[in-house]
Amino acid sequence: MSNVIIDLKNIDITFTQKRRTIQAVKDVSIQIEKGDIYGIVGYSGAGKSTLVRAINLLQVPTAGKITIGEDVTFEDGKVQLTTKELRQKRQTIGMIFQHFNLMAQKTAYENVAFALRHSKLSNEEKDKKIRGLLELVDLADRAENYPAQLSGGQKQRVAIARALANDPEILISDESTSALDPKTTKQILSLLQDLNKKLGLTVVMITHEMQIVKDICNRVAVMQNGQLLEEGSVLDIFSNPQEDLTQEFIETAAGIEDALAKINAQPLVKNLPASALLVQLKYVGSSTDRPLLTEIFKDFGVSGNILYGNVEILGDTPVGELVVVLDGDSDKVIAALKAIENAGVSLRVLKKGAQ
């Protein structure tokens, strides 16, 4: 039996506005497996939110095929489920948004209860479930508070509890942390990770922030202008991006752009000696364990002056990055570069010394 829970094949979504045709999503194919925390990342207008609305047919595609679990929901230009079946299928998918969409005149308890208004549970069973959900999101003591009495993070926790009320298999997060401060964002992401593990929940993260993808996701799709640019494991995408936009997202998340701007302003780099190179090194996995700069100095007499360094853990794999000035005899520097690449380290020359 396939472990794929969301299967999008060749999805097109087209709108017509004022006699103008807009293709919001163009021939996108994605497979998401049960238990994934899957990121769909792109700038505003990339088509990511439109695509994800098609997953539960809040937006009907123009073409392609969508399978959720064992059910084909859309194919050959037509919805494949009856109205009742579609409603039941949507209950297997919870959604949370940037704006929490809580009812201001209802308490946290009542907001969660609203999602169970069509449930066949008894009142006693509903009460037990609501209180259990509020405890799950660490809001058991806030059940009687109104939204105005809650912080942004607490409001999002209520929204998450409400989204889980009908025991969904999938939780879609559409920019759910965009309105939150960095500390609260980390807390919400940690909660989503816990729910993923405790409930076996498949989480789809729609975001424009690669940092969120790095923090929580195991797989990612990068979108631009309605098209899928590249897709893969977070480790593969971060360690070896194939597209310029992906590289841009990664550099923003790592802070390398700002670091390079400051590095290039340093006198050492501005007046780089003729014998020197400014290089960027990327390490993945076991290659982070080697004292590489020590080795190339010992073997080739080439010095390495570290101007920037960063090591992170993606999944269980360390990924490191260094910006280094290598200096030595020309032939020795060339030999050192080859040794670095042979060690499995990605290398990019940023600047050559003045000749």
From Swiss-Prot:
One of its GO terms (cellular component) is plasma membrane. This is Methionine import ATP-binding protein MetN. GO terms for molecular function: ABC-type D-methionine transporter activity; ATP binding; ATP hydrolysis activity. Its EC number is 7.4.2.11. It comes from Streptococcus thermophilus (strain ATCC BAA-250 / LMG 18311). ATP binds at residues 42-49. It is found in: Cell membrane. It comes from the Bacteria. It catalyses: L-methionine(out) + ATP + H2O = L-methionine(in) + ADP + phosphate + H(+); D-methionine(out) + ATP + H2O = D-methionine(in) + ADP + phosphate + H(+). Keywords: Amino-acid transport, ATP-binding, Cell membrane, Membrane, Nucleotide-binding, Translocase, Transport. Residues 8-250 form the ABC transporter domain.
